[in-house]
């Protein structure tokens, strides 16, 4: 029976993606909290600043190996600086989070395909 193991470069890329997914989950939680505040007609307060504070290091983390995903996150940060209503911002944040998550999942599959090495497992 064969199994797939990642080579060194693949393991490094996969570790970067897994850490980035944890940060993205945090961002998603903040966006949903912002959506609840907007729905309840409360002010969003410092939530856009929290998003910037979490997403900016994520851009730096991904820039070296996954530049296109980092660019998508940078675009998401630009949404925070634009004018417009909070509902429009929430919608844009949700769309960007979904795009980034899809891009990360696609990148994980690509890393597995490109850096996967088949190993033979011993029979039981």
Listing of model-derived features with the role each one plays in the protein:
Residues 37-40, 65-68, 72-75, 113-117:
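Charged, alpha-helical coiled-coil and linker scaffolds that mediate dimerization/oligomerization
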Residues 32-54:
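Alpha-helical segments in soluble extracytoplasmic regions
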